[in-house]
């Protein structure tokens, strides 16, 4: 009886083996997925180099760059001017600074969040502070803080630095960036310019998504270093832009920002007073939204663009 049972089950085992082999041969290989992240050395903060490519295309504004940070998300409106959130919290609960100046939008509906006026490539470092465990990032800190930093250049001898990039992509994406710096022992001059634009996005069915944008930015900084421990700088920054929004029946036809600041630093004053820093600045934002300059209107059954 035992021998009969053994030979009766043997064909069934061959059948299962053949079926398993056929399933193994029909395995479908998927395209590889590239995940880019930032190496963390401090659990409470993350530092980014905005000039390093962290995503397939250079960041168009500050929110676009912050997407590469863990727990950071962005509310998309179109191709630009997204609203950043950290751990689900944004708005006034996420403080934004650029060159040690707080930036605020001009629209109560968050059509122009502070990051909409920031061009990441014009800065040297981005520091993201997680949570409210700090007293140096302003009041009302709940979600965290983001600082876009320009570092002080050091010139022991007279020298000149040049940096630039050009990016071309689909949907009429055009990016250009130029940064120049010249200086010596007693001072330096730095200037940067950037231009970002893209047309409307098309989905897989070739449907046009209202999401075009264009941005321009210029910065000029003059530094004076009469001694090794003294620094006096003056900075002026100008940005202009417009953005089409797909999430509402209104577009941002004007994103203008003019900002300037003066900074004085004196180090190694006494053994018990190591550094004195004075800073004064002003920022002016002009934001206009409308329903006609960047989109088609339906009038009497006809598509009319004003």
Feature-to-residue mapping (PLM):
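Cleavable N-terminal targeting peptides that direct proteins into the secretory/outer-membrane pathway or into
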Residues: 1-25
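Acidic, small-polar-rich N-terminal luminal/periplasmic segments of exported/outer-membrane proteins
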Residues: 22-155
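Short loop/turn motifs that connect adjacent beta-strands in outer-membrane beta-barrel proteins
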Residues: 24-27, 136-137, 153-160, 186, ...
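Transmembrane beta-barrel domains of outer membrane proteins
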Residues: 65, 87, 129, 149, ...
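Outer-membrane beta-barrel domain signature
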Residues: 73, 113, 135-137, 165-167, ...
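Periplasmic-side early beta-strands and strand-to-turn transitions of outer-membrane beta-barrels
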Residues: 147-149, 155-159, 163, 174-257
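Flexible loop and strand-edge segments within Gram-negative outer membrane beta-barrel domains
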Residues: 198, 211-215, 229-276, 282-306
């Amino acid at each position: 009886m035992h021998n009969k049972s053994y030979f009766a089950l043997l064909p069934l085992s061959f059948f299962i083996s053949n079926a398993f082999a056929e399933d193994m041969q029909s395995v479908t290989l998927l395209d590889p997925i590239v995940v880019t992240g930032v190496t963390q050395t401090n659990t409470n903060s993350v530092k980014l180099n905005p000039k390093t490519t962290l995503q397939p295309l250079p960041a168009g504004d500050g929110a676009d760059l912050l997407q590469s940070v863990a727990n950071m998300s962005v509310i998309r409106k179109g191709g630009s001017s997204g609203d950043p959130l950290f751990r689900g919290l944004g708005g006034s609960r996420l403080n934004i600074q650029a060159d040690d100046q707080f930036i605020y939008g001009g629209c109560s509906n968050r059509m122009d969040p502070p990051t909409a006026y920031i061009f990441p490539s014009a800065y040297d470092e981005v520091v993201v502070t997680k949570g409210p465990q700090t007293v140096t990032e302003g009041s009302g800190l709940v979600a965290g803080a983001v600082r876009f930093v320009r570092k002080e250049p050091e010139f022991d001898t007279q020298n000149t630095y040049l940096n630039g990039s050009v990016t071309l992509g689909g949907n009429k994406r055009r990016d250009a960036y130029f940064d120049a710096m010249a200086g010596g022992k007693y001072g330096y001059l730095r200037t940067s310019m950037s231009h970002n634009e893209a047309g409307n996005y098309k989905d897989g069915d070739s449907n046009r998504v209202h999401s075009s944008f264009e941005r321009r930015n210029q910065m000029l900084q003059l530094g004076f270093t009469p001694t090794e421990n003294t620094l006096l700088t003056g900075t002026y920054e100008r940005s202009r832009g417009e953005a089409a929004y797909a999430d509402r029946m209104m577009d941002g036809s004007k994103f203008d920002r003019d900002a300037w600041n003066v900074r004085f630093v004196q180090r190694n004053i006494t053994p018990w007073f190591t550094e004195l820093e004075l800073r004064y600045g002003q920022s002016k934002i002009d934001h206009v939204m409308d329903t006609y300059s960047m989109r088609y209107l339906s009038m009497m059954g006809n598509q009319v663009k004003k």
